[in-house]
């Protein structure tokens, strides 16, 4: 779901990109919100809602958390502002948060999974990171069956309330 759009078609606040596959492939144990360092045209491109984070991952580099392999396409409106669409982008977190998440990654063998990129109420770009434990194939099947059952149950409840 995209966030609220202005006249120009840009997202002012709300969801810019979502990693639905991340929630399916990983059991999310804990989430946090982190700021992201972006250049001007990257923000404009992100506001158009054209970013992809399906293949993205977060990892440690020099004691900081970075977002790798996220795709933010070049903004077509700018002429002089070129940037690398898949460049690593620094995530802004407190030192204690970084230590907590890196400790969990090294101890439990978990992964830092970017779940979405959104704009908060102040218009700042944020990344929701999840500490995820990888799911096995049978766990994925169980998740699919559970999701289907919830959908069918909701459908039955809706249809049982109708008068014939």
Swiss-Prot record:
- What organism is listed for this UniProt entry? Gluconobacter oxydans (strain 621H)
Output this protein's name. SsrA-binding protein
Q: GO molecular-function annotation terms?
A: RNA binding
Q: Tell me where it resides.
A: Cytoplasm
Q: Which InterPro entries match?
A: SmpB, SsrA-bd_prot, SsrA-bd_prot_CS
Biological process according to GO: trans-translation
Q: Carries keyword Cytoplasm? A: yes
Q: What does this protein do?
A: Required for rescue of stalled ribosomes mediated by trans-translation. Binds to transfer-messenger RNA (tmRNA), required for stable association of tmRNA with ribosomes. tmRNA and SmpB together mimic tRNA shape, replacing the anticodon stem-loop with SmpB. tmRNA is encoded by the ssrA gene; the 2 termini fold to resemble tRNA(Ala) and it encodes a 'tag peptide', a short internal open reading frame. During trans-translation Ala-aminoacylated tmRNA acts like a tRNA, entering the A-site of stalled ribosomes, displacing the stalled mRNA.
């Amino acid at each position: 779901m995209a966030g609220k759009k202005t006249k120009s078609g840009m997202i002012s606040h709300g969801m810019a990109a979502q990693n639905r596959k991340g929630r399916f492939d990983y059991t999310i144990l804990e989430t946090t919100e982190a700021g992201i360092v972006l250049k001007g045209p990257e923000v404009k491109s992100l506001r158009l809602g054209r970013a992809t984070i399906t293949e993205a991952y977060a990892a440690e580099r020099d004691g900081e958390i970075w977002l790798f392999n996220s795709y933010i396409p070049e903004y077509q409106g700018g002429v002089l502002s070129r940037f690398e669409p898949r460049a690593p982008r620094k995530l802004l977190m407190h030192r204690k948060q970084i230590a907590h998440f890196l400790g969990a990654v090294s101890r439990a063998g978990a992964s830092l999974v970017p779940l979405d990129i959104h704009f908060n109420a102040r218009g700042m770009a944020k990344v929701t990171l999840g500490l995820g434990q990888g799911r096995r194939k049978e766990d994925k099947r169980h998740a699919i069956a559970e999701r289907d059952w919830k959908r069918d149950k909701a459908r039955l409840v809706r249809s049982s309330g109708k008068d014939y």
